[in-house]
Design a protein with these regions (language model features):
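N-terminal phosphate/diphosphate-binding loop that engages ATP/GTP or pyrophosphate donors
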Residues: 28-93
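Walker A/P-loop phosphate-binding motif and the immediately C-terminal alpha-helix
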Residues: 5-41
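Active-site signature of alpha/beta-hydrolase-fold catalytic machinery across serine-
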Residues: 21, 25, 48, 144
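Conserved catalytic-core segment of NTP-binding enzymes
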Residues: 111-211, 221
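Cytosolic-facing regulatory segments adjacent to core modules
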Residues: 78-87, 91, 96-132
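Phosphate-binding P-loop
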Residues: 1-2
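C-terminal alpha-helix
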Residues: 241-253
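C-terminal boundary of histidine-terminating zinc-finger modules
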Residues: 225-236
């Protein structure tokens, strides 16, 4: 059974950055290949991990809907979907990436989605660690794209508005009865003078633990240039913070 971490947060708070650094940290700490799932149509997890997927699950879903009866001879729909999903999985340095891609258009996707959910759950079980970069509204979790999460990481920026958004996401997770072993808050981009204020705002808000990740000029430059976060130095204080956080999250559950 895999250890699954779902990362959520509103746009612009560094959700995908935290996801990418968690993938890297888990691989470097354990030596295991990590499964990275980009479940946000507006995300660029592949870019931050230094790979560009040529296929997405969304592309496959649309293709199946348009040509469901035009399949290779002797191959069932389920076999075809599973084969295409394997092709859509990109191998990287210490990780495998699967991108969900565009959201559903008009039409009935129930049968296709059921096959995809089954394949995704079975594929996740082949990995020791899975990191899912989710949509802010957690639609994939609510549709049971995955069975359960060991840790739900809610990412915020160091503002009151950001914290309030995280609070709503946590409440939403509870309302949807998503199976979560631990809820964690990550306040990203914190500068030194903000730490006491951030810690005060986070107090009593999360069931598990609150973490702060500092601001980094090097990280900001990599993001601005669209470069892989795997290039971030081992000694960078952001990466060290995420690495320490990943250790604690694993031991919480």
């Amino acid at each position: 059974m895999s250890f699954r971490i779902a990362v959520v947060g509103k746009g612009g708070v560094g959700k995908t950055t935290i996801s990418a650094l968690l993938v890297r940290a888990l691989h470097e700490r354990t030596g295991k290949v990590v499964m990275a799932v980009d479940a946000d149509p507006n995300s660029n997890l592949g870019e931050k991990l230094g790979v560009m997927p040529e296929r997405t699950i969304g592309d496959l879903r649309e293709k199946m809907l348009k040509s469901a009866d035009d399949l290779p001879a002797g191959q069932s729909k389920q076999e075809y979907v599973e084969y295409q999903m394997r092709l859509a999985t990109v191998e990287g340095d210490g990780f495998d990436l699967l991108s969900m891609g565009r959201p559903e258009g008009p039409g009935c996707y129930c049968y296709i989605n059921n096959i995809m959910r089954t394949f995704l759950d079975e594929a996740m079980d082949d990995y020791d660690f899975v990191v899912i970069d989710n949509e802010a509204g957690m639609e994939h979790l609510s549709r049971r794209t995955t069975k359960s999460m060991d840790v739900l990481v809610a990412v915020s920026d160091p503002t009151k508005t950001g914290m309030e958004t995280v609070g709503r996401l946590v409440s939403l997770a509870k309302e949807m009865k998503i199976e979560v072993g631990c809820l964690a808050l990550v306040v990203n981009g914190v500068r030194g003078q903000q730490i006491p204020v951030v810690e005060q705002m986070a107090e009593g808000m999360i069931q598990c633990k609150a973490f702060t990740v500092p601001f980094s000029d090097d990280l900001a430059n990599l993001n601005a240039e669209g470069r892989s976060l795997l290039e971030l130095g081992e000694s960078d204080h952001v990466f060290r913070a995420v690495k320490a956080m990943s250790d604690q999250l694993i031991h919480f559950v």
